[in-house]
Swiss-Prot record:
Name by which UniProt lists this protein: Fumarate hydratase class II
Organism phylogeny: Bacteria, Bacillati, Bacillota, Bacilli, Bacillales
GO molecular function, one term: fumarate hydratase activity
Site positions (Important for catalytic activity): 324
Miscellaneous section: There are 2 substrate-binding sites: the catalytic A site, and the non-catalytic B site that may play a role in the transfer of substrate or product between the active site and the solvent. Alternatively, the B site may bind allosteric effectors.
Family: Belongs to the class-II fumarase/aspartase family. Fumarase subfamily.
Annotated positions binding substrate: 96-98, 122-125, 132-134, 180, 312, 317-319
This protein's pathway: Carbohydrate metabolism; tricarboxylic acid cycle; (S)-malate from fumarate: step 1/1
EC annotation from Swiss-Prot or TrEMBL: 4.2.1.2
C-alpha cells in the first residue's frame, strides 16, 4: 500500500507504512549505491540537534511552543531507537548530507503530525527552521563523533590499560632477553616490556582526549554559506548551550562558521589520533603473536589462550587469531584515515561536499577499534601467560649478556668473548674464562641478568 507525497518537483509514491517523505524517497531511488546505510549515530545526533533547535526557535518566538514540544517528543523517540526503520538512506548521496537532513526533517514532521494533525508541522519551515543542511550535517558529525569516542573507544582503552597493568605487575621480575632489529639484545623483564605496551595506550588516550576538543565547536548557526542567513545572530550559541544540557558534552558555537562549513580539519585531526592508536595496537598485537610463535619451533615465550581449532588440516594447531583480527582492524583504520584526509581536502569555496564519507569512515574506525580491543582483551590478553622455562633458557643462552662486561674489560674484549662462544657453540661463561679476560668469580659477579635490567 502506498501514499502520495509531494515536494517542489511534484508527486511521488511512498510506502504507506514508512514515515519519510518525498525528498527521502527520491534519494532512495536515485542513490541505489552499495549497502552502507548512513550511520545511525548520525541520525540520533540529528535528532538531538533538531530538539535543541526547536527549543531555541520557540524561545525566540519563531516557533510555537506546541510545535516545539511535538518536535522534541519525536526526537526523543528517534534517539531511543524507536524509529530506526524510517531512515533508509545510504552514505553515497549528496556530499552535503542534504538528503539525510531532509529524511530526519520529514520523519519528525510526519510523526508529529500524527498527533497534531496533517500539515501542522512542515519539514522545512518548522523542523528545519533557522537551519541549512550545510550547518546541520557538520554539527551532527561532531555530536556523533564526540559521543562515540566518549562512550565506546575511550572506555575500551582504559579497560585494556588495566589488564596490561596487571600483567606488568605480575611479570615485573621475570627476566627475558630483549630484541632489537629482530636480533638478541640485552635483557629486560617481561613486566618492563609490557609496561611499554601499557604506555602506548596511556599516551594514545592522552592524545585522543586532547585532540577531541577540536570537535566541540559546532557549525550550527552558519546556515547556507556561513553568514547565518535566516538565523538569529546568537542562534549557534543558544543551540550549542542547549546541546550541552542534553548531552553533558561541552559543545560551543564555532567562532568562524565559514571555516566550520568548508573545513573538516577538526575531524581529520582527531582521526589522526585514532590512527596513531591503531598503529600502536598493531605493534602490540604483532609483538604478542611473535613472542607466542611456536610452540616448539618459534620464540614461544608467551602462551596465548586456546579459543578455537587453528587449522582445518593440522590437528592441535593454535593460531594467534585475536592478534590477526586486531592487525586487520588496524590496517582498515589506517585506510580510513587516508580516505578522511583526502575527503577533508575537498572544501571547495564555502562547502566541503564529502561530509558523509568522512563521518562514515570516522565512526567505522571508532566501532572497529572499540570492538576489536574488547575482543582482544577478553580472548587474548586476559588469558595471556608467560612460558617461564623457555624464557629462562633463552636468557641463559644469549650472547648479549656479554654487554655487562663492557665497563670492566672493554668493548673489543667483550666482543671477542661473544664471537668465541658463537663460533664454538659454548656458553658465554665458558668462552669468557677460556679467553682469560675474566675469572669465573668475576663473570658470576658481573653477569647478573636481573641487575642488567636496572629494575
Amino acid at each position: 500500500m502506498e501514499r502520495i507525497e509531494r515536494d517542489t518537483l511534484g508527486e511521488i509514491s511512498v510506502d504507506a507504512t514508512k514515515y519519510w517523505g518525498a525528498q527521502t524517497e527520491r534519494s532512495k531511488r536515485n542513490f541505489a549505491i552499495g549497502d552502507n546505510p548512513m550511520p545511525i549515530e548520525i541520525i540520533y545526533a540529528f535528532a538531538q540537534l533538531k530538539k535543541a533547535t526547536a527549543k531555541v526557535n520557540a524561545a525566540e518566538g519563531k516557533l510555537s511552543e506546541e510545535k516545539a514540544i511535538a518536535i522534541g517528543q519525536v526526537c526523543d523517540q528517534i534517539i531511543q531507537g524507536e524509529l530506526d526503520e524510517h531512515f533508509p538512506l545510504v552514505v553515497w548521496q549528496t556530499g552535503s548530507g542534504t538528503q539525510s537532513n531532509m529524511n530526519v526533517n520529514e520523519v519528525i514532521a510526519h510523526v508529529a503530525n500524527l498527533t497534531l494533525g496533517e500539515g501542522q508541522i512542515h519539514p522545512n519551515d518548522d523542523v528545519n527552521m533557522s537551519q541549512s543542511s550545510n550547518d546541520t550535517f557538520p554539527t551532527a558529525m561532531h555530536i556523533a563523533a564526540y559521543g562515540a569516542l566518549v562512550t565506546k573507544l575511550l572506555p575500551e582503552i582504559t579497560k585494556m590499560e588495566a589488564v596490561l597493568a596487571e600483567k606488568k605487575s605480575k611479570y615485573m621480575h621475570l627476566v627475558k632477553i630483549g630484541r632489537t632489529h629482530l636480533q638478541d639484545a640485552t635483557p629486560l623483564t617481561l613486566g618492563q616490556e609490557i609496561s611499554g605496551w601499557e604506555a602506548c595506550l596511556t599516551n594514545n588516550k592522552n592524545y585522543l582526549e586532547t585532540s577531541m576538543k577540536a570537535i566541540l565547536p559546532l557549525a550550527i548557526g552558519g546556515t547556507a554559506v556561513g553568514t547565518g542567513l535566516n538565523a538569529s545572530r546568537d542562534f549557534g550559541d543558544k543551540v550549542a548551550e542547549e546541546l550541552m544540557k542534553q548531552t553533558g558534552y561541552p559543545f560551543t558555537s564555532d567562532s568562524n562558521k565559514y571555516f566550520a562549513l568548508t573545513s573538516h580539519s577538526p575531524i581529520n585531526f582527531v582521526h589522526g589520533s585514532i590512527r596513531s592508536l591503531a598503529s600502536d595496537l598493531m605493534k602490540i598485537a604483532n609483538d604478542i603473536r611473535l613472542l607466542a610463535s611456536g610452540p616448539r619451533s618459534g620464540i614461544g615465550e608467551l602462551t596465548i589462550p586456546v579459543n578455537e581449532p587453528g587449522s582445518s588440516i593440522m590437528p592441535g594447531k593454535v593460531n594467534p587469531t585475536q592478534c590477526e583480527a586486531m592487525t586487520m582492524v588496524a590496517a582498515q583504520v589506517m585506510g580510513n584515515d587516508v580516505t578522511i584526509n583526502v575527503a577533508a581536502s575537498q572544501g571547495n569555496f564555502e562547502l566541503n561536499v564529502y561530509k558523509p564519507v568522512i563521518i562514515f569512515n570516522f565512526l567505522e574506525s571508532v566501532k572497529l577499534l572499540s570492538d576489536s580491543m574488547r575482543s582482544f582483551r577478553l580472548h587474548c590478553l586476559e588469558g595471556l601467560t608467560a612460558n617461564e622455562k623457555v624464557i629462562e633458557t633463552k636468557v641463559n643462552d644469549s650472547l648479549m649478556l656479554v654487554t655487562a662486561l663492557n665497563p670492566h674489560i672493554g668493548y673489543e674484549k667483550a666482543a671477542k668473548i661473544a664471537k668465541l662462544a658463537f663460533d664454538e657453540n659454548t656458553t658465554l661463561k665458558e668462552a669468557a674464562i677460556k679467553t682469560g679476560f675474566v675469572t669465573e668469580k668475576q663473570f658470576d659477579l658481573w653477569i647478573d641478568p636481573l641487575k642488567m635490567t636496572n629494575l
